[in-house]
Design a protein with these regions (language model features):
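N-terminal leader segment of winged-helix/HTH proteins
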Residues: 1-35
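Conserved segment of winged-helix/HTH DNA-binding domains
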Residues: 16, 27, 93-112
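Hydrophobic patch in the ABC ATPase nucleotide-binding domain
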Residues: 21, 80, 112
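N-terminal helix-turn-helix DNA-binding core of bacterial DNA-binding proteins
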Residues: 23-66, 90-97
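Residue-level detector of secondary-structure transition/capping positions
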Residues: 51-52, 76, 107-110
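Residues within the DNA-recognition helix of helix-turn-helix
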Residues: 71
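Beta-hairpin "wing" of winged helix-turn-helix
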Residues: 76-86, 93
Length: 112
């Protein structure tokens, strides 16, 4: 059986140069895993439209507050959402429009 021909050395070095290192690969995997939960996706979608508090998100998404709070905590831990406090109410928003762009890229890819 013949061995498959490997890339030429120049191409191999080029590919290796542009590949993310193991640490970056892990960070990317963790980042994209945040989009692998339907509740988090819906939270991101809602926050791309308007800044909202937990109660409003729970109402709009027809999900209990505990679930929403848990998902927001994960999104906060990874820096996808930020918050401001107004009295006793905490309002959440996307940290950057790029978060919504990532999701919209997925929507576009799927042809919706």
């Amino acid at each position: 059986m013949m061995q498959p021909k490997l890339l030429d050395k120049r191409k191999q070095k080029e590919v290796q140069y542009y590949l993310p290192d193991k640490e970056m690969s892990q960070k990317l995997a963790n980042f994209f895993a945040l989009f692998a939960d339907k509740t988090r996706l819906r939270v991101i979608s809602a926050l791309s439209i308007s800044e909202m508090c937990v109660n409003d998100l729970a109402c709009v998404l027809d999900t209990n507050q505990t679930t929403i709070s848990h998902q927001l905590q994960l999104l906060r831990n990874y820096g996808l959402v930020t918050y401001t406090r107004q009295g006793k109410t905490v309002f959440y928003k996307l940290a950057t429009a790029k978060i919504n762009q990532v999701m919209l890229s997925g929507v576009e890819y799927l042809g919706f």
